[in-house]
UniProtKB/Swiss-Prot annotation:
Residues annotated to bind Cu cation B: H366, H370, H406
GO cellular component: extracellular region
Disulfide bond annotation, renumbered to this chain: C580-C622, C582-C629
Keyword set, alphabetical order: Copper, Disulfide bond, Melanin biosynthesis, Metal-binding, Monooxygenase, Oxidoreductase, Secreted
Cofactor annotation: Cu(2+)
Catalytic residue list: E351 (proton acceptor)
Functional summary from the UniProt entry: This is a copper-containing oxidase that functions in the formation of pigments such as melanins and other polyphenolic compounds. Catalyzes the rate-limiting conversions of tyrosine to DOPA, DOPA to DOPA-quinone and possibly 5,6 dihydroxyindole to indole-5'6 quinone. Binds to the surface of hemocytes and is involved in hemocyte melanization.
Co-factor binding comment: Binds 2 copper ions per subunit.
Molecular functions per Gene Ontology: chloride ion binding; copper ion binding; tyrosinase activity
Protein's recorded name: Phenoloxidase subunit 1
Subunit (UniProt): Heterodimer. Forms a complex with an interleukin 1-like protein as a consequence of a host defense response.
Lineage, opening ranks: Eukaryota, Metazoa, Ecdysozoa, Arthropoda, Hexapoda
Regulation: Activated by immulectin and lipopolysaccharide.
Amino acid sequence: MTDAKNNLLYFFDRPNEPCFMQKGEDKVVFEIPDHYYPDKYKSLSNTLSNRFGNEATKRIPIRNITLPNLEVPMQLPYNDQFSLFVPKHRTMAAKLIDIFMGMRDVEDLQSVCSYCQLRINPYMFNYCLSVAILHRPDTKGLSIPTFAETFPDKFMDSKVFLRAREVSNVVISGSRMPVNVPINYTANTTEPEQRVAYFREDIGINLHHWHWHLVYPFDSADRSIVNKDRRGELFYYMHQQIIGRYNVERMCNGLPQVKPFSDFSAPIEEGYFPKLDSQVASRTWPPRFAGSVFRNLDRTVDQVKIDVRKLFTWRDQFLEAIQKMAIKMPNGRELPLDEVTGIDMLGNLMESSIISPNRGYYGDLHNMGHVFAAYTHDPDHRHLEQFGVMGDSATAMRDPFFYRWHRFVDDVFNIYKEKLTPYTNERLDFPGVRVSSVGIEGARPNTLRTLWQQSTVELGRGLDFTPRGSVLARFTHLQHDEFQYVIEVNNTTGGNLMGTVRIFMAPKVDDNGQPMSFNKQRRLMIELDKFSQALRPGTNTIRRRSVDSSVTIPYERTFRNQSERPGDPGTAGAAEFDFCGCGWPHHMLIPKGTAQGYPVVLFVMISNWNNDRIEQDLVGSCNDAASYCGIRDRKYPDKQAMGYPFDRKMANDAATLSDFLRPNMAVRDCSIQFSDTTVERGQQG
């Protein structure tokens, strides 16, 4: 059974090559029944089986099963793009996930996969199989290959692949030099938005967004796959933190905070030209010109027919629910939005997912915003164009408009949050615990250093129909020197205590260099870490390494570095180890800063663990990046609201962060200093 489970990973190898061809560096071949071959290969089944099987080092016989009805998922053409935001695509994917989840054992799943891989759109097949592997009890422990490894065309300049194919065909494996990905290739310096392209187009950040939506799908016949603990609240908080981080990056680069796109009839000021090619669709991703507008959609091929005015209706109904602090249910009654579960319900309404309390009334606001933005260039399909990057969770964060749309979404959530009663002293203080200081230890005290770093990602598994062997792409990304937090705490109770340490960071001044009120600064507070800590009586010195952040996952997990896997690199068996790919990339933990040193404030709070804890066993679970991703098959590991204590405003609009501080909190003025130098991975401090 273990072999059969591992064999599933071969379906991710070279996704456009038929599964009867050799897979993996160890030349594995699936021996499929004759009637599994598509019509174009049926007459050649024996020839193909012998051709690829003779050189195989391992043959995997495929069980002949009664095949399920694949009529619905096969409605998406093999060479089209696939979007979770398009309702028709969502329905097709939900059906395929249901089929994969319904297979009685791994052997049957392997069998239906071999049939589907030859017929189903590769993007949809990859997504649905990934969701099934994550959620089936008999496939847990499998590490799904990173999407950037399987479909690298979604993450980097299309010119890279011409060079990569040349290298693959001309140079033998083992002698190939990495192919360089330029750091700036979508615009030049006359475009102000290009100053933050390093953030928007970062491979790790886009992988995070893709993987988050993989862990939290919003449609499935199996409701339990979608209905995870505090899923709607996590949708709110993860995206709120993205907008907070993006705004801080903009401020570091002399740009104003991102403007919400709240007037759906207004022109979109920002254009975007992605410079990506789809290897499945054999098309260039369409651009969006500056000044584009949302237009009524009438795309029969996608079964999308919707008026822009519908967005206004859904928005107004959503705002009405917040004003009333109650949502309208399908039966006509009203369900109150309380301070504990209200944000979770609103998150499910906004996204929206199948667990939306009333999708018929509140609609599909967030998703359809993505769809309208993705089709500004061809709203009625007259030019036979497919959607732009806003239509794909793996590419959407590249587009400046993603942040304008999600700033609007976050502003709506914030209206609800501002209606909640400000936290009282009792909700904030931890009697007997006094934080006397917090600081950062690094090369220089309370100074964070950032720089450029070059790393590599494997392309070989995604280069279909080319000679085998490793082909690396070298790309440049932001990085920071590692550091540690030093927190001095005094426990005056005379007994042992447990606390939850919460660490945030925000700019010290606004876009104009002026001090910020608490209510403005709190929305720029980015979470850096959260962990439980024993506090013995008297003075405690807490040291916490930045690499242990509860927000991030390391480079090796973001990019599935083959050298870090157990076993022989390149084999399916090497991929099985306890792994979770959802988490903010660690190299983007700290904003870029400036050459002069960008002023930020570091905040630490220690709350009472007895008020925060969730009783559950976390042994063997993936829990090292829980802040933005939760924990697989467990409850969110913090009873407090996500973003606490900055998710609510203070009653006094003029109050500052210093007015907010309690004895169990401390702040420190710090600086982020950027050095415009580039180092190879492993060379930074």
